[in-house]
């Protein structure tokens, strides 16, 4: 059996389990925020061979329908300070933050400090495998302060991060 068929089986099993998890958590409404950094507003248009052709808004609507027992919010900014402000704003009241800081992942000590300053756990996600790209993308200031890291699985990375909070 090749790796791609094993991955498909694994993703199907994750989807099945995620539906069970969503059902079990229907009694408690969790608050999970997805925060996207620079250029992620261009998903669906920007480098579709790397990031896919679906917009994040389309994907987010699907997540909301699939996980009705979770209060999902979405925020995107191309501005570092606005991302920090959002982390500060929700970082003491939400159950989890799913953060794709985009290129700020590799440059922003300030975002890492904001994550350390709040109590809400943060999961770092990336659509592409940053380690298979340019060498400057191999360093993350977010990973050392995040609960975990999921990357390289396309938009599914966000759903897997969401499942980990349930």
Description of each model-found segment:
Residues 90-97:
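Short acidic/histidine-rich motifs immediately flanking catalytic phosphotransfer sites
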Residues 108-117:
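Short Gly/Thr/Asp-enriched flexible loops that form oxyanion-binding sites at enzyme active sites
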